Amino acid sequence: MSHSVRVYDTCIGCTQCVRACPCDVLEMVPWDGCKAGQIASAPRAEDCIGCKRCETACPTDFLSVRVYLGSETTRSLGLTY
């Protein structure tokens, strides 16, 4: 079952999620929208195993990285992005 990985613009560019991922799903890409000048990206979301370690590692109040397991979607959870 595939999982969906979403990175929101609340990302502060700290790299915690990238370092926490055991499957190398996330990477940092250049972005001018935060002080760090980079944002997490999920180019290999198909490799996500759904462990949610990236969510646990995220230091922002609203998790900048979210993993939606299988049939979960932002709509079914009442979230927007």
Swiss-Prot record:
Enzyme class, first EC level, given as a word: oxidoreductase
PROSITE patterns tied to this protein: 4FE4S_FER_1, 4FE4S_FER_2
GO cellular component, one term: chloroplast thylakoid membrane
Co-factor binding comment: Binds 2 [4Fe-4S] clusters. Cluster 2 is most probably the spectroscopically characterized electron acceptor FA and cluster 1 is most probably FB.
InterPro entries for the chain: 4Fe4S_Fe-S-bd, 4Fe4S_Fe_S_CS, PSI_iron-sulfur_center, PSI_PsaC
Binding positions for [4Fe-4S] cluster 2 per the UniProt entry: C21, C48, C51, C54
UniProt cofactor(s): [4Fe-4S] cluster
Membrane topology: Peripheral membrane protein
Keyword annotations: 4Fe-4S, Chloroplast, Electron transport, Iron, Iron-sulfur, Membrane, Metal-binding, Oxidoreductase, Photosynthesis, Photosystem I, Plastid, Repeat, Thylakoid, Transport
Cellular compartments annotated: Plastid, Chloroplast thylakoid membrane
GO MF annotations in UniProt: 4 iron, 4 sulfur cluster binding; electron transfer activity; metal ion binding; oxidoreductase activity
Catalyzed chemical reaction(s): reduced [plastocyanin] + hnu + oxidized [2Fe-2S]-[ferredoxin] = oxidized [plastocyanin] + reduced [2Fe-2S]-[ferredoxin]
Domain 4Fe-4S ferredoxin-type: 2-31, 39-68
Example of a GO biological process term: photosynthetic electron transport in photosystem I
EC number: 1.97.1.12
Residues given in the record as [4Fe-4S] cluster 1 binding sites: C11, C14, C17, C58
Subunit text: The eukaryotic PSI reaction center is composed of at least 11 subunits.
Role of this protein: Apoprotein for the two 4Fe-4S centers FA and FB of photosystem I (PSI); essential for photochemical activity. FB is the terminal electron acceptor of PSI, donating electrons to ferredoxin. The C-terminus interacts with PsaA/B/D and helps assemble the protein into the PSI complex. Required for binding of PsaD and PsaE to PSI. PSI is a plastocyanin/cytochrome c6-ferredoxin oxidoreductase, converting photonic excitation into a charge separation, which transfers an electron from the donor P700 chlorophyll pair to the spectroscopically characterized acceptors A0, A1, FX, FA and FB in turn.
Protein name: Photosystem I iron-sulfur center
Protein's organism: Emiliania huxleyi
Lineage start: Eukaryota, Haptista, Haptophyta, Prymnesiophyceae, Isochrysidales
Gene it is expressed from: psaC
